[in-house]
Amino acid sequence: FGSGFKVKYHENDITTNIEDLGAKIGDRFREFCKSYGRELTLVFEPGKFLVSESGYLLVRTNVIKQTTATVFCGVDSGQNHLIRPMMYDAYHHITNVSNPGGIERIYTVVGYICETDTFGWDRKLNEVREGDVLVLHNAGAYGYSMSSNYNSRYRPAEVLIHNGKAKLIRRRENLDDLLATQIEAEL
């Protein structure tokens, strides 16, 4: 069976009750095996269900820019790190962890890539200031695997939190990483 298990992105999203689903499928599968006269193996490809909610993208605010219609919050990341909002119009909840008690305001959170690089349009966030850290939720699925070095940008580090302790599991890329696969051509 393949993916499709629901993950909660919006507050009122329907999620998959994995225990209930497992019980129902398990019962029917055992009945099928019995009627088929053979023991079979049932395998699931869980997709984003296992990892989406366990990953967060932390970004730092570089600039706040007010226009006549919009307040933009520019951050030090972009679609090269989390392309889902741009590619699929996917919603990722955003939280300002640097100012949890701040007054709610409306921001459009944008990245540093030159195209229309937007993480979230017209989002209610606690007041955002330059230097504040924002958290993009549900970034565990496909974040790294869909990331790129577009515009010669480095991929970020990945940190695992286990039993309250942080452990670096993937270092941030650097210029050597960008150049590592290039071969000097003799012309």
Annotated model-derived regions:
Residues F1-G4, S35, L160:
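Short intrinsically disordered, low-complexity coil segments enriched in acidic
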Residues G37-L187:
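Charged (often Lys/Glu-rich) extended helix/loop segments that serve as interaction or gating elements
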Residues H10-E19:
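Glycine-rich tight-turn/loop motif centered on a GG-T
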Residues F1-K6, P46-K48:
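Glycine-rich beta-strand-to-loop/alpha-helix junction loops that act as flexible
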Residues L21-C33:
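Alpha-helix-loop-beta-strand connector modules within alpha/beta enzyme cores
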